[in-house]
């Protein structure tokens, strides 16, 4: 059951909480000024889930959970500029909590074009026993899309390890008119899975973005990595295997 324990452990690694973080700033709900959509109010939103969580890979290919630790996180980007991300590492060094305040893309009359695309580069340092390596096989994202006709929104993520050129990417595009919460489960193609180096700790990089385009310059849209409070929830699932060399 070690593999199941590892998956449960790292599935929480980037989970979001709304509790104050001791020693850091106190995050809170931020009200977002939505564009003026026809009707004057935001209609009821549905929830979309793209796929179910994949099964545990099983077997004895995972390291002891007590020897897997998140030792540091760095970040940067227009969606997470300095000072806009709260983070805390649990006492057992097993859980990383991140809360983003400015991960929102907007488009429409009077909106600066710089607001059409937001991105965030995350670097997550993991320490784990030698003889093992891991890969990201899926990630969950939760957000909100309100797009008028003529507006398209894209959420994309790229995963890679420091010092390696191989990448795994996932992407989803919505076309307006649409108004809904979304829950995405991105599962990497098995043929393009990227593994951390053997015999070395893995620095996992996640470069994510939300982007809006429009064929009608009068159309409006907003795309976030969570609903109106704009807190961003991301859960990363990993697969372990023993090194073969």
UniProtKB/Swiss-Prot annotation:
Positions bearing carbohydrate: 189, 225
Principal subcellular localization: secreted
Record key words, sorted: Glycoprotein, Secreted, Signal
Domain of life of the native organism: Eukaryota
UniProt-listed Pfam families: DUF4360 (PF14273)
Gene Ontology CC annotations of this record: extracellular region
Location relative to the cell: Secreted
Signal peptide annotation: 1-18
Region of interest (Disordered), residue spans: 21-66
Protein name: Uncharacterized secreted protein ARB_07590
């Amino acid at each position: 059951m070690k593999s199941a324990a590892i998956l449960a452990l790292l599935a929480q690694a980037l989970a979001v909480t709304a509790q104050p973080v001791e020693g850091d700033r106190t995050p809170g709900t931020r009200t977002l000024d939505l564009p003026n959509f026809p009707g004057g109010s935001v209609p009821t939103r549905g929830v979309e889930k793209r796929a179910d969580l994949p099964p545990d890979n099983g077997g004895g290919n995972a390291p002891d959970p007590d020897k897997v630790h998140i030792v540091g996180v760095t970040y940067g980007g227009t969606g997470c500029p300095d000072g806009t991300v709260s983070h805390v590492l649990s006492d057992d060094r097993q859980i990383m909590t991140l809360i983003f305040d400015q991960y929102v893309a907007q488009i429409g009359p009077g909106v600066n074009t710089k607001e059409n695309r937001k991105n965030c580069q995350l670097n997550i340092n993991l320490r784990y026993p030698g003889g093992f390596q891991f890969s990201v096989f899926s990630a969950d994202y939760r957000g909100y899309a309100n797009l008028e006709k003529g507006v398209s929104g894209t959420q994309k993520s790229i995963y890679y390890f420091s010092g390696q050129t191989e990448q795994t990417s996932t992407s989803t595009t919505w076309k307006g008119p649409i108004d809904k919460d979304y829950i995405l489960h991105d599962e990497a193609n098995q043929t393009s899975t990227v593994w951390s180096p053997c015999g070395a700790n893995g620095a996992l990089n996640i470069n994510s973005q939300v982007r809006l385009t429009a064929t009608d310059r009068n159309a409006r849209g907003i795309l976030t990595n969570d609903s109106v409070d704009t807190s961003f929830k991301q859960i990363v699932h990993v697969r372990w295997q023993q090194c073969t060399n």
